[in-house]
């Protein structure tokens, strides 16, 4: 009987919970306390379970008994165990209510449904996807050992070289691959520039109306936004100088202003570059949608005219698809080290395989062929929307059909009451941004920013019909210009 009792006691002195101790850390009692606390709170050690004696657990873990004594005393203070005189230490039968963190406020993260007229959608090209998949498989299958380790914070040299060739041929931007950084998109690139070049509270000119995502990126990074109005020639540089001539930077979309679609005139471009030199300021040039120009030669980018103050931002999100998460920065040579340091501090370096696969497609002419196939399809989509809105809206909306890009702007008459655009959108049952969403200062008529890429022609025509009829019904003849 005595032998049986001893066996029983030894079995009780074995903890059925693996505890791994870091012997390099001196406070072993804290490690034991933390492991036991987690086991009890997570339910791995049930209420009422007898814990091993301090001597038995010390032998099991190979530590001094006083470390276990200290751990048990801490658990007693936590209310997680109870000591029974002459019987040992047990997990408390009634555990304290767990301290549950209050739920975070609901995040305003909304992924718009893929239906007309959502922005940022592109047509799926099966030919391109097959070629990209094949290039990715080849890159992974034949990866050299040095391609599997840490990489350059600027990204793949192969892709940077191809981007440099593309920009020289199509955007008039001549740069060395060493001045290009591969990023995960325009907002990532913009944030890198902010971290590297600006301080919290620095004033930044921002087009008004302008691109909402970039406005959010700048404001959350601590920039002081200075709204600068836009007219038919683009950013009104003189208005910016009047509002805050000593601003540290300007964010612009000169080749295809978002959302108005106007191109910045050459006189304004020269004025903006002159201001940046005088003010020792930077220009963040977002050259989105530049690949899809439907009439006339491509416009030279601002960075191609006077690039020493210009940081150029480009993306493959519209050329290919947003889920690719690849974009690029072109940085003046004097600023490269600062921006690279900011990149290395954020996420060290970008993943290489998809970059090299995309570079292979660029080198083989696959990407250029893809854009040639897409341009007429997107031009047709633009025309379908414009014609349907004109037919069914019967003049209730003013249209600005762009010669470039993947969205058009339809504005209400100046006399339309506030809130009318939202009522029209809701009645039409469409997905789109309102022009008022893009404004910092609410001035001028409201309207609709209509993305037309990524949708079948019949779906675009149907959505435009519903929008046009809703506008006609709600505005009425009296609200239309005579």
Give the residues covered by each predicted segment.
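N-terminal basic, amphipathic alpha-helical segments
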Residues: 1-139, 148, 159-161, 340, ...
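Hydrophobic beta-strand scaffold residues
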Residues: 225, 283, 431-432
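Conserved core of the PLP fold type I
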Residues: 145-280, 291-292, 297-305, 309-311, ...
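Short glycine-rich anion-binding loops that position phosphate/pyrophosphate groups of nucleotides
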Residues: 122, 254-258, 318, 455
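Short, polar loop motifs at secondary-structure junctions
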Residues: 209-212, 436-440
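Active-site PLP attachment segment
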Residues: 305-338, 350-353
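Flexible, Gly/Pro-enriched loop and linker segments at secondary-structure and domain junctions
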Residues: 309, 432-433, 438
């Amino acid at each position: 009987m005595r032998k049986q009792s001893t066996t029983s006691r030894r079995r009780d002195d074995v903890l059925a919970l693996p505890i791994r101790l870091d012997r390099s850390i001196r406070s072993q009692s804290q490690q034991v306390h933390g492991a036991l606390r987690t086991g009890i709170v997570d339910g791995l050690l049930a209420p009422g379970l007898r814990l091993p004696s301090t001597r038995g657990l010390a032998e099991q873990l190979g530590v001094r008994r006083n470390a276990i004594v200290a751990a048990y005393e801490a658990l007693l203070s936590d209310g997680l165990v109870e000591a029974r005189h002459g019987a040992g230490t047990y997990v408390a039968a009634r555990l304290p209510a767990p301290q549950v963190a209050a739920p975070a406020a609901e995040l305003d993260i909304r992924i718009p449904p893929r239906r007309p007229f959502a922005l940022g959608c592109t047509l799926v090209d099966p030919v391109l996807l097959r070629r990209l998949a094949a290039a990715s498989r080849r890159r992974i299958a034949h990866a050299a050992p040095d391609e599997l380790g840490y990489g350059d914070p600027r990204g793949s040299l192969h892709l940077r070289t191809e981007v440099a060739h593309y920009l020289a041929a199509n955007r008039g931007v001549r740069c060395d691959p060493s001045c290009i950084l591969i990023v995960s998109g325009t907002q990532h690139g913009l944030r890198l520039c902010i971290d590297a070049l600006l301080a919290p509270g620095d004033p930044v000119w921002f087009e008004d109306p302008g691109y909402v995502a970039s406005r959010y990126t700048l404001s959350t990074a601590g920039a002081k936004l200075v709204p600068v109005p836009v007219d038919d020639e683009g950013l009104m540089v003189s208005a910016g100088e009047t509002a805050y001539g000593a601003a540290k930077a300007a964010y612009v979309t000169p080749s295809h202003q978002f959302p108005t679609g106007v191109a910045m005139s050459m006189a304004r471009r020269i004025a903006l570059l002159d201001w940046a030199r005088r003010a020792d300021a930077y220009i963040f040039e977002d050259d989105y949608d530049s690949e899809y120009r439907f009439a006339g030669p491509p416009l030279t980018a601002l960075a191609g005219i006077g690039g020493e103050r210009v940081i150029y931002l480009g993306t493959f999100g519209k050329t290919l698809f947003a889920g690719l998460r690849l974009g690029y920065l072109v940085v003046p040579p004097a600023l490269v080290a600062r921006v690279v340091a900011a990149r290395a501090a954020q996420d060290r370096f970008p993943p290489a395989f998809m970059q090299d696969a995309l570079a292979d497609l660029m080198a083989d002419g696959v990407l250029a062929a893809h854009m040639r196939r897409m341009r007429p399809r997107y031009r047709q989509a633009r025309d379908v929307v414009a014609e349907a809105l004109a037919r069914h809206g019967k003049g209730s909306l003013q249209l600005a059909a762009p010669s470039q890009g993947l969205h058009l702007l339809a504005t209400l008459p100046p006399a339309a009451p506030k809130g009318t655009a939202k009522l029209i959108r809701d009645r039409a049952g469409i997905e789109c941004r309102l022009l008022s969403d893009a404004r910092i200062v609410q001035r001028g008529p409201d309207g609709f920013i209509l993305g037309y890429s990524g949708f079948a022609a019949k779906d675009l025509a149907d959505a435009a019909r519903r929008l046009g009829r809703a506008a006609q019904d709600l505005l009425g003849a009296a609200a239309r210009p005579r």
